[in-house]
Structures are given as C-alpha cells and as structure tokens.
Amino acid sequence: MLTQWNTRAQNRKFVASYSGGKDSSLALYQAMQIGEPVVLIVMLEEQGLKSRSHGMSLDIIHAQAKAIGLPIYSASATWQDYQSQFIQLLQKTQALGAETLVTGDIDLMAHTEWNQSVCDKSELSLCMPLWQRPRSDIVHEFIQLGFQSIIVTVNLNLGMTVEDLGQVLSLEYVNELVARGIDPCGEAGEFHTTVIDGPIFKHPLSVVKGDILYHENYAFLPLELEQRDI
C-alpha cells in the first residue's frame, strides 16, 4: 500500500489538492515527474476570499497557479460541508481526464483515511508522494530543490513566536526550529508557509508583507502581491 500511495500518479493525469504551502508544492513537483497535472483544487472559506487551510488570499492563490501554469477549481465551504464540496470538485475534474488525486500528506492516518474516502466516492485513485518519508528529509529536499517559502502562520502555543513570521524556510532556519523542539514540517500545526518560487514555478512571485494579525493562539502574516504580479 505504501508503494502504491507514493506512485499512483505514474503515467496518469492527476488533480492536486493545493494549499500553496511547502508540502503540497513538493508533492505536486514529485507527481509532475511521473504524471500529468490537469488542475489544482483549492478549498476556500465561506466568504470565498481566502483559502480554507492556510488563510491565503485569492490574489496569491491565483498568482501561484499562473506561475505553475495550471487552472484552479475552487469552492467555498464551511467545515460542515467541506467534504461534499471537495467531492464535487473531484468529480468535476474527471471531465479533464483526471484519474488520481495527489495530496501532500506525510504520515497522519486520519488525513489519509479521509483522502481515501473522498477518492473512493469520486472514483479516483490516491497518490501521496511524501507518504511516510522522514520529515527532515522532506523539508531538506524542498529547500535543496530551490523552493522558496515564507512562514505566514504560527501557533503561539506550540513553540512558535511572532518573530518567526516572515522567516524564509532555509536549512539554517529549519535546524533552529529542530533545536527548539519544533517539527521541521510543522505537522502538528506549528506553522504554515506560502511558496513564492521553485522548480514548479515559471517565475517567482513578488510579495509584500502586511500587518500581523492575531486570532486566539495564532498569529498571521498577510502577503500581498506587488503591483507587477497582479
């Protein structure tokens, strides 16, 4: 099952669940080496102004997709109707010939079971290129491939601080996180990233940093596109 989950995009057209962060970007890159991407799926919050997973603005999301060279299928959803909306998008991708869903999940079985369930209901196979790889290997490969990402969300209750916002994910910074007892991939929700360049991008995104926002135990750094990218 492990091997199948890693390689099910082999010689297939696939749809990628895309958050705009490091894990989904690396998974997309890996799948593109063996299969053919047809569309990105991005789930939005109820108002349809930001991504559901990372709180990323629509401008950034569309700029990422343009730089990658792929269209986006998106839907606004509450957590209550998230699954049904996601399945509808997956079913829509079949008209493009999609056979497989690619996700950036690493080792959380609950996420995998959910992914497999929506794939079964959509008659797609599931591909998780990063599945059960060592987390340090994943983030090191991400950086060494030339991806550039910025820390945009931190959980202040899990060892992260406001000073971490805006940090570029580098090998030196990852080592610092590990020394602080923080998972290098942020798999416990310690942090989220926004990818602004990498081998899947035809050109980098030029962004400016907004004012830090707070909500409960989270701090957020909004990113906006410079005028030339709009």
Name each model-derived stretch.
Residues 1-230:
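Nucleotide-activated chemistry modules centered on ATP-dependent adenylation/adenylyltransferase
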